[in-house]
Amino acid sequence: MALFPRGILIALVLSFVLNLGLVTKIHAKDTLDSIIDILSGLTCETQGVGDLMRTEFSHTCIVAPFFTFAVMNLVSPVLYMNTFLKLKINDSDLFNDSNFGNFPGGQCTRENRIDPKNPELHFALCSNAKLIVSRAKSVTESALAIAKAVLTWSDPWDDIKQAWENKKKEYHIPYRGKPGDDGFAFDVGFPVIYWKVIQDRDRICVSTKGFTGDVPVGCKYMKEPFPKSIYNSFIDVEDKNFIKDSTNDTPSDPLALVSCSAAGDGCYQKAYNASKTAIVMTSPLIECIRQMIARLLISKDVCSFDNVDQVVNLASRQDSALFQFQVGMHKIVTAFLTLYVMFFGFKLLLAGKVPPKSEYINFILKIIFVTYFSIGININPSNGSQYDRLDGMIQWVFPFLLNGISGLANWVMNAAPSGLCKFNNISYDKSVSYIALWDALDCRVAHYLGLDILSTLLVENSYRSHDFLNFDFFSFSAPPYIYLIIPAIISGNMMLVSLALSYPLLVISVAAFMVNATIMCMISIVILGILAPLFVPMFLFAYTRNYFDSWVKLMISFLLQPMVVVTFMITMFAVYDYGFYGKCQYKSKLIHNSIEDKMQGGIKSKRDVLIFYINNDWDDTSQYPDKDSVESCKNSLGYMLNNPINTAFNFAKDNISEIVNSKPGETTTDEFLSKFQFLSGVVLGPGMFFMSPKVLFEKIKNIFLALITACFTLYLMYNFSSQLAEFAADMTEGVALNNVAIKPQAIFKAAMAALANAGTATKGIDQIASRGGGGGARDLIGAKGLVSDNIASSGGAVGDNIASSGGAVGDNIAVSGAASTPTVTTTTASSSIANSMTKTIGDDVRSDIVTPHASTTAVPQHSSINTTIPTSVSPNIKSTSLKEIIRDNQENEKEIDNTTRAQEKIKSSSKVSGLIDYSFNLKEHDNPTGIKQIRENAEIRDKRVEVEKAWNELVASGGGRIRDQQSEETSEQRTNAEKKWNEFVDSGVVTEIREIDNSVNNKLADKLDKSEKSKIEENKNIENNIKVYNTNTLPQEKVNNTDKSSGLIDYSFNLKEHDNPTGVKQIRENAEIRDKRVKVEKAWNELVASGGGRVKEQAGGKITERRANAEKVWDDLVKSGVVKEKKDNSSNENS
């Protein structure tokens, strides 16, 4: 019975509800849905998540990617998320009255942006405490509505719906603040929330605390223009043509905010106006390159990576090369990601155990990484637009790399100990902050070239030299080389000019290389970045991972290479400054460029210039902490030459001014004068080379030591600069830029060559003018004792044309003229020195023959040596004139360039038949760069030596002739030689030339008598290496020859090459050893040709001057250990 009333009550309530539901079924359903939606936001946190998923961002007016939220949570854990879910800025239901702020249409509309004159931000924070009270109130009102309905049998749903209306103002607390305002919000759950209003360029944000400081949570834009707007780079704030209504400062053309052309100034003018150096050279070039890159990668409407957010969702990105490639690669990248997901799924299915969680995390991070940096992440899933994507290359990679090039180099550039050209303390606009590096470079180049003379002179006298004692109208930063150019120009001595200009030319050359290398690095980064959609997906698979690693390594290398070059320049500058300026310190002064105002017709210029000058305030302990620093600066060559009058004045003032004053008290004259060190130094003392006053000697010594230091520095830096590109590439494990950029020594070498040519021309003109006519020309070509002065030998009986193309007995002196007959000369085998006489032959042969004197012994000439002495039939030449010519040419070896490289052709003649000719088809690199080309040149030289050995062996065995002898038998030596030679011909290394059957040599062979042929046949197997004043023959490792009277000594070459050279050092050592071998062979051949090098000397042999010189050179090689003689004749096979 106790349960009966309770059961009846439950049955009545259920029947009431069911009946009520049948009556108002549709109305109840809508009301229940509204209640369920409201109950899903039981707390401020759950309500914030619901708003984030179902509506637009309510916490900010500026849309941000989800990736940003994840990053911010790492920077500010817990605090950021709690503030993020409770903050409300973009909510029209809240901000529509005076309490929260009246913003018709919503707080985030264009018309309701923050006024820059009153930068106040309105926002609200959700309170869980008030939310609990509001929800309790709704439950109470719903219960009352149900009770009312039960008693009155009315419809309760309208009352329930009204009770559960989302009254946001009941549980939100309004705030307002300007930049700098902060406070705390207290609540249930997470008890304290710290907030602060900050300004970030053209936006006002509500922030909270994080590891890196204030972390923005929700932001709102300010109206433009305002003093520090990011749009100042694109529009002229003072130009009213862009403003439709001056009262609200609204631009009439919104695209003007992101249009580079609206500014009215090009890239050059922008960089020039932002530069702080007096002479602007490099920064406009870099700025134009950066703008070109921004237009190429982002859009034609932007000039900087700082404004990429302005065109993210615009169709103007269609002009971007990177964007077009990304669109084209979209399906390919999607295919890569699909394959990666499939492979990972197969791995999970086929694995015997569950993979660790780290693999799942790695899987997800790889997909996000590849998508973000290859084609971009779609920030709006409901929108399929290609323009609405987050691109990691544009937002992170390119700004980091391109700004990092200048940033890293700028750290090094401003590390100069003297304080010269330091621009890091000057404030630049953020968009052009990189110009500090190029201002420092321009300042350095202008300083060392003396281009900043006028500007420094103006600031020197305007800001520092106000009194007469310190006034120096000759004070300017002219470099010391100026004082060498003046006497060089007056005296005409080009050596002084070369010495004076060597350092500034090296500075220009290295600076040009730095600018060129930086530009090439920027362009290379752009090319690699555009290919990111191709290389980034290769990160997914182990098989293609190496391609991605190489791509990243190249990007980092191009980032670091300019820093390495700048480090070298700073080292060069610092050593030079210390050598010339000692411990002098520089001060700077920022002045307005009034000169440009006058040049522009009185229009006021906005550009300020930073001027540097030597600080001669010796009492400034911040820069000169001790007296040694002061004395080092005063006694430096640079300071004395830059400040000549000031130096002389201070010297006289410190040492003489007190002497003129009256002597104090009863002090004796000797005691009074003993206080002045200047007078005690006037006495004569020993100098470096002669007696001189001590004071004068000290000054000369300082100058001399400074010059030695500067020259030594120049020598070191010059040699190191030749390998600067390779050094930078090796340090960064990248590609050297010397093949695509100007070489560090290019300008220096070109200028030095021009100066050398100018000096040679000046010297030649002076000699011709002093000696007159032909004598000067004859001395210039080194042909003394000849009959005529005709340099080209185009007329006359005998000319001075010296053709150094063969050379055995003497130089091949080709004489042409109207009275002479074309001649060809052949040598004899009778002696080591051929004596010649003239003989005329008919037109069928048309050659001159040098016939031998009578001799009982015939020694055949070595076949690899071609000795021709063409002479004329002119009766004006005596029989001894040829010997005199040979002797004069030997004495003037330095004037006649007869030390050419190893010949690529060998043209030889034989007593019996003419030798064939051949050409060597392999060609070395003229200016080898890199290990590969150096190694190829070494291989070509080795191949040339092999060819020459094979050719000499072929000729020595009786082969290699156009027409063989009738009675000649083919020996085994000749067969082997011909086989080896044919291998070179078949491989294409050499090409034979046999089209000389009717040559002079073969016609001469038909004219020779039988007795000569029999003598040659008798001695055809004897090899006699005759080297008669010929430096053009190819090197041999050994020369084992015999003479009829005494055998030659044997020797061994003691230097050994690396078998498999690795690295530049071993390749260079091998090249040096080969050069040393050539030098040894030249010395040996000269020794043998002069009659030396025998085991037993010939009886009655006379030692000539030539032999004495040859033996001296050979003995030096023996003493140095390069070669070792074997005079016991045990190893000489021919003795």
From Swiss-Prot:
GO biological process: protein secretion by the type IV secretion system
Family matches, as Pfam families: TrbL
Alphabetically ordered keywords of this record: Cell membrane, Membrane, Signal, Transmembrane, Transmembrane helix
Source organism per UniProt: Rickettsia typhi (strain ATCC VR-144 / Wilmington)
Membrane topology of the entry: Multi-pass membrane protein
Lineage of the species this protein comes from: Bacteria, Pseudomonadati, Pseudomonadota, Alphaproteobacteria, Rickettsiales
The protein, known as: Uncharacterized protein RT0032
Localization: Cell membrane
Transmembrane regions: 332-352, 359-379, 393-413, 495-515, 522-542, 555-575, 700-720
GO cellular component: plasma membrane
Signal peptide range in chain numbering: 1-28
Family label: Belongs to the TrbL/VirB6 family.
